[in-house]
Amino acid sequence: MDSLLGCGVSAAAREPVPRYLTSQPRVSEVAMQSAPLEQPAKRPRCDGSPRTPPSTPPATANLSADDDFQNTDLRTWEPEDVCSFLENRGFREKKVLDIFRDNKIAGSFLPFLDEDRLEDLGVSSLEERKKMIECIQQLSQSRIDLMKVFNDPIHGHIEFHPLLIRIIDTPQFQRLRYIKQLGGGYYVFPGASHNRFEHSLGVGYLAGCLVRALAEKQPELQISERDILCVQIAGLCHDLGHGPFSHMFDGRFIPRARPEKKWKHEQGSIEMFEHLVNSNELKLVMKNYGLVPEEDITFIKEQIMGPPITPVKDSLWPYKGRPATKSFLYEIVSNKRNGIDVDKWDYFARDCHHLGIQNNFDYKRFIKFARICEVEYKVKEDKTYIRKVKHICSREKEVGNLYDMFHTRNCLHRRAYQHKISNLIDIMITDAFLKADPYVEITGTAGKKFRISTAIDDMEAFTKLTDNIFLEVLHSTDPQLSEAQSILRNIECRNLYKYLGETQPKREKIRKEEYERLPQEVAKAKPEKAPDVELKAEDFIVDVINVDYGMEDKNPIDRVHFYCKSNSKQAVRINKEQVSQLLPEKFAEQLIRVYCKKKDGKSLDAAGKHFVQWCALRDFTKPQDGDIIAPLITPLKWNNKTSSCLQEVSKVKTCLKF
């Protein structure tokens, strides 16, 4: 049976099927859609009110009117709700109703029933079976009308539950249409025009694909429709907190504008999600679709951000939204354990598509072989106590493909995400925003004014902050913004800071606390025969980039568990040596790129020599790339340093301390 349900078939056919229903073919989509379809009205945007009003709570036992049954989401129906529906349609014979009760046929299984299956279950009357199938088909058709379809260039036609549509049709979510996925990368890769909006749709969809496949393969996990909805919502909303130009905002701008603020976009995402729910009054809508807001909002936020700082009292399980028996649900959207999650799957496929780069990872194959296994851990405080945790595992033969996945991630970082000019443009936009920050006003809650850097403190203000701020500053008539405008005009005219070259530390990596003083080091590393040009620290930009497999210097596969065909319940680990001798020895490295803000030939010649001298003093690798310094590399002897050179390093570091 195909385990990739939800990745190309109708939403009604994505539900787990009981064993007694798997021997016969499913009802075709054609049969399910045989009833005449009315042309649906256009879905409204941003007003928070979809065409179909939210249903009453999924417990339908108290419902009697036809319209009430038509408008409820049958995926939330329990067996008793199915019996209530059948009674309402005239099937009042206890024997027939008991068939549905005894076999625990929930609403999600109704689309898979046909005459043969009903006969196998014990519905003997042909007339009764035909009448029952007709009722179920009408019900299935109404459910299809509730779902909305998006034509996505990556995943094809993807369907979303009405609750997800309510979330999508809010100003807070629509804001993602105006935030570039790759920030300044669009100025280097002309195809990289995609935004956080479509990526978020893709992650929400893939989250549903994976969790439904697990629910079908392993019904004993008791994954409910409520769980599935929450996982999809987390996927949909995981990037709500991104600022202008995506990672540029929380990775470069905020650390420089507010160095005391340890803020990341994940924090912004959970705050924006709360604002989205409250300002659009979605808690009642969530209840109407079977969610429990008090628990499920916490669960959704935990999937995005990770466990709370303060764990649950007297418990080894750090989460509050779901118990430890459903620990695997936290590994779908943002996998803190090993980094294998649907967020990566979508941006691999989507970014490669728009960048014109080949994507070699097939997420559908991973879903095909994914299953949940229980892993035992010994608790450090008490070696005798063993904690059992359920993890998403893959077949042992897939280990090579997972190494390829992380290699793909590394390649994307090298070729696109950390492209030397993409990063440079992000740096220049950051410089412009820092110049503009004191003079830009954004109206927030109760009319309070915020700056670009303080909008993260108020979600109403942050909702208004998108990539559009670039054009607002560029075209402003405020003379106070002239410096910022000059930088932005230089970006548009391709008059960029000059790239000098790239190097790497041979031994210890540069620590974060050292980053700020690196330009001073370069400025002070003046060679003996340097041109008579004075260069200051502010003339240099030193960009330190850490490239890894997603877990700093650790091998992420060491934290992945596998199962074998002979025993699908036992989780095992696979060492790197068991896979291949050609796999990397190190899983992280540091790149150091240096740029110069001055652009005249004399200054650039001097800056190049400063950079080469600095690399020699710090015992970094010979600089590569930068045309300006290429002729200067050969004469220097990196491996035979004199004591005076080492003394110079000490002098430079000593000066910088004061």
From Swiss-Prot:
Keywords: Allosteric enzyme, Antiviral defense, Chromosome, DNA damage, DNA repair, DNA replication, GTP-binding, Hydrolase, Immunity, Innate immunity, Isopeptide bond, Manganese, Metal-binding, Nucleotide-binding, Nucleus, Phosphoprotein, Ubl conjugation, Zinc
Modification sites for Phosphoserine: S49, S55, S64, S125
Catalyzed reactions per annotation: a 2'-deoxyribonucleoside 5'-triphosphate + H2O = a 2'-deoxyribonucleoside + triphosphate + H(+); dATP + H2O = 2'-deoxyadenosine + triphosphate + H(+); dCTP + H2O = 2'-deoxycytidine + triphosphate + H(+); dGTP + H2O = 2'-deoxyguanosine + triphosphate + H(+)
SMART domains listed in its UniProt record: HDc, SAM
Alphabetized InterPro entries for the sequence: dGTPase-like, HD/PDEase_dom, HD_domain, SAM, SAM/pointed_sf
Binding site for GTP: K148, V149, D169, Q174, R177, R494, K498, K565
Residue span of region Disordered: 23-68
Domain notes: In mouse, the SAM domain is required for deoxynucleoside triphosphate (dNTPase) activity and ability to restrict infection by viruses. It acts by capping allosteric sites.
Family listed: Belongs to the SAMHD1 family.
Name assigned to this protein: Deoxynucleoside triphosphate triphosphohydrolase SAMHD1
